[in-house]
A protein has these predicted regions:
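Bacterial N-terminal signal peptides
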Residues: 8-19
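Activation targets extended, charge/polar-rich intrinsically disordered C-terminal tails
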Residues: 139-434
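Glycine-rich catalytic cores of cysteine/serine-nucleophile enzymes that process amide/ester linkages
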Residues: 38-116, 333-334
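A eukaryotic "domain-start" boundary segment
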Residues: 25-42
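A structural motif
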Residues: 125-138
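Second-shell loop/turn segments in exported
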Residues: 50-51, 115-124, 143-152
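Bacterial N-terminal signal peptides that target proteins for export
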Residues: 1-9
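Sec/Tat signal peptide C-region and signal peptidase I cleavage site
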Residues: 20-24
Length: 434
């Protein structure tokens, strides 16, 4: 029996540990209070844009370093999983991210291998502020605190850094950044997506007027480069009551080579898109006139291909936009004026275009009616721009899609002529024979 006492005591201890996990042992020393504020350095890290769409915006993190204990950790709020459940949640507008910590040097090597800029700004905080921010970051990594619901413009991996810095500064950062921003969120999106014009147009198409409203500099800091810029300009009140720069020093760990810089202003694609839209619509009219004159297969097949192309390029996004508005929590897609330009009806041009290519007798008339509806909706969307509530900045999409729709409606109306001519010729021949 005496021998069982130590064993029972040990088992009881293990049960207590299981019931109350010892989170303290998982915390960095600045999370437990072991680190002293005067021994800490806090760095805002800005990573430049990358190659894939998700990395076009860049990325940001915070590094906490304890010089006395020779420890450093990088805190990254951009962690997410590519499993099936994540894709489903993202499709429904509920994407869950989390924060994790990692080795700063290993992270820097990784971004260097991707040829992405790595820039550091050491924050000029008081020892008490450094200790507070370090503890905040360390506690956020704990399993019960780490997850958050990602929102691209208002709650992302950079706004979390901004909010943490502002908290330890007593709201000074928010106050200093409360002035008007340089441009709308849509203009920022267009700047950063300039590296991929087709994807830029798709994103432009999917987003409503939420991102066209005036914003503050604080809201612009959803972008890593904007937060970096604003922190560099910031003056904060120090322990002596005097204002000091928030950035004590800048460190460039790596500068990318051969990567295009993000433009300061959004690109002006409107005139180019208008020319493309007019060329597409005019081309459809030209094919219809050719078909009317010759009655050959080539113009019919080419006109069918134009319909198939339009259905693929604009019909699928139009259908997706409608579904996102009606059935998901992607509020940035709601009540989108681009549905006047492309919508689920637009997708019908795909099968009808295929039927036209294969010589269906009913396809031309069905397409004509469809295009009259689509062109009418596009014109209606343009006319409604006169009302204040229709304020979405979709002019470049109007310039591209509306001439196409009007041109196709005209082309399919003209395509009725050959059938009418053939019928009148047949009637004349029968009368002559009689």
């Amino acid at each position: 029996m005496p021998r069982l006492a130590p064993l029972l005591t040990c088992l009881l201890g293990l049960l207590l540990l299981a019931a109350h996990p010892a989170h303290a042992q998982d915390l960095a020393p600045w999370g437990t209070g072991e680190s002293r504020g005067e021994d800490l350095s806090i760095y805002l890290v800005t990573f430049g844009p990358g190659d894939d769409v998700a990395s076009w915006w860049g990325h940001g993190s915070l590094v906490v370093e304890d010089h006395r204990l020779q420890q450093a950790r990088l805190y990254n709020y951009g962690m997410f999983s590519f499993d099936e459940s994540m894709l489903l949640r993202y499709a429904m507008g509920r994407l869950e991210f989390w924060v994790d910590d990692a080795s700063p040097n290993a992270t820097f090597r990784f971004y260097r291998s991707l040829n992405r800029d790595v820039r550091l700004q050491e924050l000029n905080l008081t020892p008490a502020q450094r200790a507070e921010l370090g503890k905040l970051l360390a506690v956020n990594v704990l399993p019960e605190n780490r997850n958050y619901l990602y929102q691209h413009y208002s709650d992302n991996c950079v706004t979390r850094l901004r909010d943490g810095i502002d908290k330890v500064l007593g709201g000074q950062l928010h106050q200093a950044m409360s002035g008007p921003g340089r441009m709308t969120l849509r203009d920022h999106v267009r700047r950063y997506t300039d590296v991929g014009p087709p994807m830029s147009l798709l994103l432009d198409f999917l987003m409503n007027d939420e991102i066209d409203q005036p914003v503050t500099r604080w809201q612009e800091a959803f972008l890593p480069d904007e937060l970096e810029r604003q922190v560099a300009e910031m003056q904060v009140v120090g322990e002596d009551g005097q204002k000091h720069p928030l950035v004590a020093r800048n460190v460039t760990v790596y500068e990318s080579h051969g990567r295009p810089k993000t433009p300061d202003q959004p690109p002006k694609y409107g005139p180019v898109l208008l020319v493309l839209g007019l060329a597409f619509g005019g081309g459809a009219v030209g094919l219809s006139l050719w078909r009317r004159k010759s009655g050959g297969r080539a113009p019919r097949i080419l006109l069918g291909l134009q319909n198939v192309f339009f259905g693929l390029v604009f019909g699928i996004p139009g259908f997706a936009l409608f579904i996102m508005w009606m059935f998901t929590e992607h509020t940035v897609t709601y009540r989108n004026e681009n549905l006047f330009l492309a919508n689920p009806l637009t997708l019908l041009t795909l099968p009808l275009g295929i039927q036209l290519m294969f010589g269906s007798e009913r396809a031309p008339e069905r397409l004509r009616r469809l295009w009259l509806v689509l062109a009418g909706l596009g014109v209606l969307g343009l006319v409604l721009k006169a009302l204040p509530m229709f304020d979405q900045d979709n002019w470049r999409l109007i310039a591209l899609i509306l001439p196409m729709s009007v041109g196709m409606a005209g082309a399919l109306t003209l395509s009725r002529a050959p059938a009418a001519n053939r019928a009148s010729d047949a009637l004349a021949s029968s009368l002559k024979a009689s």
